Amino acid sequence: STLSAEKIVALQPNLIIDVGNVTPNYIDQAKRTFVQTGVPYLLLDGRLSATPNTLRELGKWLGVEQLTEQQAQYAEETLKSAVDFSAVLQQTAYLARSAEGLQTGQKGSIHTEAMELVGLRNVVEGEHKGLTQVSMEQLLLWNPDIILTQYAEFFQTIKNNPQWSQLSAVKNQRVFFIPNQPFGWLDSPPSLNRLLGVRWLQHLLSNKPMADFAPEVLHFY
C-alpha cells in the first residue's frame, strides 16, 4: 500500500526499510521521504544476486546478525546451486503476468531474474529492463519452450485459448503455475520469496516429483 509522509510520521517508526531498486530516482525518493518525515531511510539493493549482502546489512541494523548470517548463507547456497544448474539448461521461457498473460518482464528485469538465474532464456528483450506489454503476434514469433505464470485465471484458460494453443509450450504441456502463497515464489513481490522459487524451478525442470519438494518449503519458512 501507499502511505503519505504524514501517516508515516504518525506511526512513529524508528526506521524505514525499502528493499528494491536502487537507481537514482529511488535514491532521490528515499532522500525526499527522509526530509519529509525525519525517519532514517534504509534503501537496500533488491536484486537476487545481492540478497546475501542485503540480509547481512539488515542484520546489522536490526541487531540480529546471527540470524541473518544463517539466512545469508542459505541465499548463497541457493544462488550457487542455480548458477551450476544453469550451465546445463538450454530452454527459452516467457513469464506471463496479468489475467490476459500479455504483461511480462524484459530480460534482466527484477521480475524475471529468478527464472533467468537457473538458465531459462527470457524471450523478451528490452532496453529499460522493466515490465512491458507484448502482443500475441510477438509471442507467436518468439514461441517460448516454457511459459510460467502465477495468475490462476490465466493458467485456467490458456489451454483452451485457440491463440495460445498454437505455442509450443502449450502443445507440449510446458505451462507451469508458479506457487503464490503467501507470496509469489518468482515475482510479486520480487524479494526473498524468490530464493524458494529458484529452488522450486530447479526441482520442476529436473522433472522430480513435486511432493518431494515439501521438505524444502518447510525448511525455508
Tell me the role of every PLM-derived stretch.
Residues 26-103, 124-126, 133, 179-221:
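Extracytoplasmic substrate-binding proteins
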Residues 104-130:
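Alpha-helical, coiled-coil/dimerization segments enriched in small aliphatic residues
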Residues 145, 152-199, 203-204:
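Active-site/pore-lining binding-face segments in mid-to-C-terminal subdomains
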Residues 84-87, 104, 114, 137-141, ...:
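Short, conserved, surface-exposed binding loops centered on an aromatic residue
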Residues 1-9, 78-85, 105-107:
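Short, composition-biased local secondary-structure segments
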